[in-house]
From Swiss-Prot:
UniProt keyword annotations, A-Z: Cytoplasm, Electron transport, Iron, Metal-binding, Transport
Origin organism lineage: Bacteria, Pseudomonadati, Pseudomonadota, Gammaproteobacteria, Oceanospirillales
The record's free-text note on cofactor binding: Binds 1 Fe(3+) ion per subunit.
Coiled coil: none
Family: Belongs to the rubredoxin family.
Pathway assignment: Hydrocarbon metabolism; alkane degradation
The protein's role, per its UniProt record: Involved in the hydrocarbon hydroxylating system, which transfers electrons from NADH to rubredoxin reductase and then through rubredoxin to alkane 1 monooxygenase.
The protein, known as: Rubredoxin-1
CC per GO annotation: cytoplasm
Keyword hit for Zinc: no
Gene3D superfamilies: 2.20.28.10
């Protein structure tokens, strides 16, 4: 599982954890997150996220 970081605000999407409050189940790969999903902290789209090694 990978982690993706918002380059604008630093929010981390962790594939292992998902975002259950937003309907994204734990274990959901980044490419399976809906294309219209936006960062819950700053509102930018998936194009503004980069994979990170933590």
């Amino acid at each position: 599982m990978k982690k993706w970081e918002c380059v604008v605000c630093g929010f981390i999407y962790d594939e292992a954890e998902g975002l259950p409050d937003e309907g994204i189940e734990p274990g959901t790969a980044w490419n399976n997150v809906p294309e219209d999903w936006v960062c819950p902290d700053c509102g930018v789209g998936k194009d503004d996220f980069e994979m990170v090694e933590i």
